[in-house]
Amino acid sequence: MAAPYPGSGGGSEVKCVGGRGASVPWDFLPGLMVKAPSGPCLQAQRKEKSRNAARSRRGKENLEFFELAKLLPLPGAISSQLDKASIVRLSVTYLRLRRFAALGAPPWGLRAAGPPAGLAPGRRGPAALVSEVFEQHLGGHILQSLDGFVFALNQEGKFLYISETVSIYLGLSQVEMTGSSVFDYIHPGDHSEVLEQLGLRTPTPGPPTPPSVSSSSSSSSSLADTPEIEASLTKVPPSSLVQERSFFVRMKSTLTKRGLHVKASGYKVIHVTGRLRAHALGLVALGHTLPPAPLAELPLHGHMIVFRLSLGLTILACESRVSDHMDLGPSELVGRSCYQFVHGQDATRIRQSHVDLLDKGQVMTGYYRWLQRAGGFVWLQSVATVAGSGKSPGEHHVLWVSHVLSQAEGGQTPLDAFQLPASVACEEASSPGPEPTEPEPPTEGKQAAPAENEAPQTQGKRIKVEPGPRETKGSEDSGDEDPSSHPATPRPEFTSVIRAGVLKQDPVRPWGLAPPGDPPPTLLHAGFLPPVVRGLCTPGTIRYGPAELGLVYPHLQRLGPGPALPEAFYPPLGLPYPGPAGTRLPRKGD
């Protein structure tokens, strides 16, 4: 029995009568038969009608989205599986890419004019057909030949395009990355660097903060906070239409092994090289993945040499076949710093690679010159990786894999004191006495004696100071010490020499030519001098301490990078004396 109608006083019944399958509610009151008001049946009809309208609208939208997806430059198997949000994102990105590419040099665009009208494909020559097919597949062939993936970023740091080869090197999807922000895929500690490389943020002045090497990959990834990307990014005024870019970033990867990288787990170090087009405010670059860290997975060829270095780039061990490519043996390399063999013009780039190595855990250096013992140099390129020790998890070292790119060049050009002929060293061995002698008391016309708190005189003889052409008159009254009175054991290895006439003769205490048993970390070799000054290096020279030259690098002996002196004391032109003529900066021990 049906429930009583609420307004019937509880004594009536509600029945549904009608024919032909229709159900009409009626209210039987005493002596009356009244039609009941609209009930659940009419509401159900309205809901059904609304659902049908929404279903029809969604069907039309899906049809339009399907047609839009077919216009995307993607394979049909991929475009048919996209959702609506992905279709809209890829469509907007493609339109932005077309606008970005139209500003290229030369501008890129679809072929406006096809074959001549009325000329059927069958009537075209074989050469025209081959050329057309080649142009259609040219992009794919180029991507397959590149050892990396290509991508383009707009002014906001979003991927306008990224090649499908990114799945080979990072294991990520091209469809998911296109239109997304690059900051969603790079390490939080590299956000500031990417902003600077894109020209969206002015590089902050001051020295870089020395990173700390942590054995825990999870804790190291949380050291750097994600920088805020302001809505109104300050764009640097373009100094040129095209600017070259080369930097290293850590990008997410699903192909990295657990515990492989000590700096960040789940990230790969990518070497990004490309061009920043300032007028279009975008970056077109190529990303290279660096070789794996384990030597078991690294194919070693005949032109490759493996070094094991400390975090300060001191050589701990090297392969014996290093003598096949250089005139230096393992005994002459072990215990020395790599900076003692690097050409002076390449020292700045090696230092930057050193900073990136300590910060990101892996780096590839540019082309640099490695000094030889007999003079000259060889060209090298190295891939360095911070690896942990199997015995001591907290200890780390550097695997330095160098590719020998050339034979020895400039064999008759000495660039450092250890490259000088052996006759100079024999001249130093006139007396076998190993004990150093104290200099004479200060007299008029001679150099002053060192103070009590000054560093002790190094073992070796005093080299005669060659006065400059304009100072011959003033130096006539000054006497020179007898070389035989200061005997020393000859060891002119890894010392820095410059002609004394280049610098003004002020009371500066010269260092001995022969260094102590272990060279101090602040020694400066002649490779750091500019070619003009380095070309003046001859046997009759004098060597000064690094503070007199204004070029020191004690930060290279620490675990992390850091400036030793302000930028004014590291002049880009390689000037050996930063202060005014006739003056020098005070140094501890003088």
Curated annotation (Swiss-Prot):
Any Gene Ontology CC annotation: chromatin
Protein origin, superkingdom: Eukaryota
Record domain bHLH: where: 45-98
Compositionally biased spans, kind Pro residues: 433-442
Gene3D superfamilies recorded: Helix-loop-helix DNA-binding domain, PAS domain
Alphabetized GO MF terms: DNA-binding transcription factor activity; DNA-binding transcription factor activity, RNA polymerase II-specific; protein heterodimerization activity; RNA polymerase II transcription regulatory region sequence-specific DNA binding
Pfam families in alphabetical order: bHLH_HIF1A (PF23171), PAS (PF00989), PAS_3 (PF08447)
Keyword NADP: no
Subcellular location: Nucleus
Listed Low complexity bias regions: 212-222
InterPro entries: bHLH_dom, HLH_DNA-bd_sf, PAS, PAS-like_dom_sf, PAS_fold, PAS_fold_3
GO process annotations (BP): central nervous system development; maternal behavior; negative regulation of DNA-templated transcription; negative regulation of transcription by RNA polymerase II; regulation of transcription by RNA polymerase II; startle response
Domain PAC: 365-408
Residue span, PAS domain: 135-207, 293-359
Assembly with partners or alone: Efficient DNA binding requires dimerization with another bHLH protein. Interacts with ARNT; forms a heterodimer that binds core DNA sequence 5'-[AG]CGTG-3' within the hypoxia response element (HRE) leading to a transcriptional repressor on its target gene TH.
Functional summary from the UniProt entry: May control regulatory pathways relevant to schizophrenia and to psychotic illness. May play a role in late central nervous system development by modulating EPO expression in response to cellular oxygen level. Forms a heterodimer that binds core DNA sequence 5'-TACGTG-3' within the hypoxia response element (HRE) leading to transcriptional repression on its target gene TH.
Protein name: Neuronal PAS domain-containing protein 1
Source organism of the structure: Homo sapiens
Gene for this chain: NPAS1
